[in-house]
């Protein structure tokens, strides 16, 4: 693993805001931003639903674990993980040991409102997507809590407010933040 600047990893269910908030925090910190799902799609050359269709969820999780291993081995990044990244113990261990983990927590109802029209979420292509989100929340919430250094509730705050909450929690936890760099000035974001 590279050494140097600390890493910041976002976990939470699909639709919790990991990519949106993560990208905003990365810009404020002047860190490169990565989304493990986007990186996996770029690496494979196909969208995640295609991976699910051809390899099933287990095949996707194998590829996801390899991507998590690679990305968490870097230094000074902000990473938004896929919602199911915490399902594998090895992923949880890598996240916990290689960075600070933020759990963006949202209620199943809020998640459903945010994801109900999104056809790129294979696990929600079901008769009862809201029920599926409730089941996923019940199964995964304890795993997110297990790896999280802190939890941010995403219900009402705006993206900017959530980013500020994350930065304040990081600072209170001793995360090395260059306060001049953590201003609202945009940074170059070369990663999707």
From Swiss-Prot:
CDD domains per the UniProt record, alphabetical: SK (cd00464)
Known pathway: Metabolic intermediate biosynthesis; chorismate biosynthesis; chorismate from D-erythrose 4-phosphate and phosphoenolpyruvate: step 5/7
GO cellular-component term (any): cytosol
Cofactor info, note text: Binds 1 Mg(2+) ion per subunit.
Gene3D superfamilies per record: P-loop containing nucleotide triphosphate hydrolases (3.40.50.300)
InterPro entries, A to Z: P-loop_NTPase, Shikimate/glucono_kinase, Shikimate_kinase/TSH1, Shikimate_kinase_CS
GO biological process: amino acid biosynthetic process; aromatic amino acid family biosynthetic process; chorismate biosynthetic process
A GO MF label: magnesium ion binding
PROSITE patterns hit by this protein: SHIKIMATE_KINASE
The keyword rRNA processing is annotated on this UniProt entry: no
Location within or outside the cell: Cytoplasm
Residues that, per the record, bind substrate: 37, 61, 83, 140
Keywords assigned by UniProt, alphabetized: Amino-acid biosynthesis, Aromatic amino acid biosynthesis, ATP-binding, Cytoplasm, Kinase, Magnesium, Metal-binding, Nucleotide-binding, Transferase
Amino-acid positions noted as binding ATP in the UniProt annotation, renumbered to this chain: 15-20, 121
Cofactor(s) needed by this chain: Mg(2+)
Catalytic activity line of the entry: shikimate + ATP = 3-phosphoshikimate + ADP + H(+)
EC numbers, comma separated: 2.7.1.71
Pfam families given in the database record: SKI
Major location category of this protein: cytoplasm
Binding residues for Mg(2+): 19
Family statement drawn from the similarity comment of this UniProt entry: Belongs to the shikimate kinase family.
Subunit structure: Monomer.
Function statement: Catalyzes the specific phosphorylation of the 3-hydroxyl group of shikimic acid using ATP as a cosubstrate.
Name by which UniProt lists this protein: Shikimate kinase
Organism for this UniProt entry: Cupriavidus pinatubonensis (strain JMP 134 / LMG 1197)
